[in-house]
Amino acid sequence: MRFCLVVLPIAIALLPVFQNIYIWFLLRFIIGVVATGVWLLSEVWINALAEDQHRGKIIALYSSLISLGLIVGVLISSLIPIETGGGFYVSAGIAVISAIPLWKMDDLPDFDAVEDISFYRYLVTAPGLMGSSWMMGFLYAATAALLPIFALPFVEGDYAQSSRTVAWLASGELTLPLFVGWLADRYDKTRLMIYISCVSVIALAILPVIFDIPVMRFLFLFIIGGSIMSFYSLGLTLLGQEFKGKVLASANASFIFFLSLGEILGPPVVGAAMDLFGNNAFGWFMALIGLIYLIIFIGSNASGKLKIKKI
């Protein structure tokens, strides 16, 4: 953990120093590795230390802070001139400040090595949970990349206005998971996941129809953004509830793997659907993907594959 905390700000600060694209590839790879290390260990520790009766609220707060960090990152890149490289140095400084409370954390769970770590194993054991992570990655990356393109015909080709639609999406990602986390500590989490899936499918399916109405546009983007991040926060909450002990670390690694896989596939797959079937496929295709996930989640829960694993 400490190795990752040291390397991360150094690698970020070195980006503006080198103008060689191959060195940039190397630095970006290093940043991805160490940032994922911090990400994974942080999630495992939070989930291991959180009590079940408060797990939903804690994970929801964590998810909202992730969204806040993404928003702050965008603001940094938009407010600080690219030519000076100042954005990189500010980001490196934020990484250093963030490392301070993590550096001295000593009340942490000690996880033993787990034999037979396999992403496929967790996909078969808990397809609904791994699917929630994949859904978040798929929808998050696809909406972030393609929403401005989808919005262009509705705003008369105004690029600035189409880009601002992402802000409404982000506002939902920031705030709604807090409400979902509060609900998760009071009601059945499995049913809540089903409800969120239904809301996301309906909202995505209706989005192309109502997008030319500004008030409805903002409302639906807010709801969609919140449901996307709720896939992640509620899935992570269920993960901590269902997997205990040393299995939690490897299960969480699989959770992040499927999220990353969804992020890789989302933009090109949805983009290809828009090319083949038109602009409205942006919402309709993602609604179809959400419906498939909903069926898988209900089926895996009915078959008893969502069960506590204590090793």
Functional labels for PLM-detected ranges:
Residues 145-161:
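Short amphipathic helix-loop junctions that connect adjacent transmembrane helices
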Residues 245-276:
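A late C-terminal transmembrane helix in Major Facilitator Superfamily
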Residues 1-13, 191-206, 287:
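Structural signature of the two symmetry-related core transmembrane helices
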Residues 37-50, 230-243:
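Intracellular juxtamembrane helix-capping segments at the cytosolic ends
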Residues 22-30, 215-223:
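Paired small-residue
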Residues 52-62, 159-160, 243-255:
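Loop-to-transmembrane helix entry/capping segments in MFS-fold secondary transporters
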Residues 1, 81, 176-188, 274-275:
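Helix-to-loop junctions at the C-terminal end of transmembrane segments
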Residues 92-111, 296-300:
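C-terminal membrane-cytosol helix-exit motif in multi-pass small-molecule transporters
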